[in-house]
């Protein structure tokens, strides 16, 4: 590779996927706390499963990518959608 474009199939070096997944989880928590969307109950259940299975945040984001897109679209959260897109295309 001669360019500086990250190749997710070779390495995650320089992408900082874990920190970005942590940020996504912070954004999710903040959104869940400020809405009465039906998604709240769904994500509460999924987060409880995550805790029981002791999976990391990147695994959770990858497993819930479509639901997260729907939730952040419903919330009209462009920052969340942008971060989610980045995670999906560079980390998952």
Curated annotation (Swiss-Prot):
Record-level GO BP terms: nitrogen fixation
Keywords, alphabetical: Nitrogen fixation, Plasmid
Pfam families, sorted: CowN (PF20543)
InterPro entries: CowN (IPR024899)
Keyword S-adenosyl-L-methionine on entry: no
Its job: Is required to sustain N(2)-dependent growth in the presence of low levels of carbon monoxide (CO). Probably acts by protecting the N(2) fixation ability of the nitrogenase complex, which is inactivated in the presence of CO.
Protein family membership: Belongs to the CowN family.
Protein name (database record): N(2)-fixation sustaining protein CowN
Organism of origin: Cereibacter sphaeroides (strain ATCC 17025 / ATH 2.4.3)
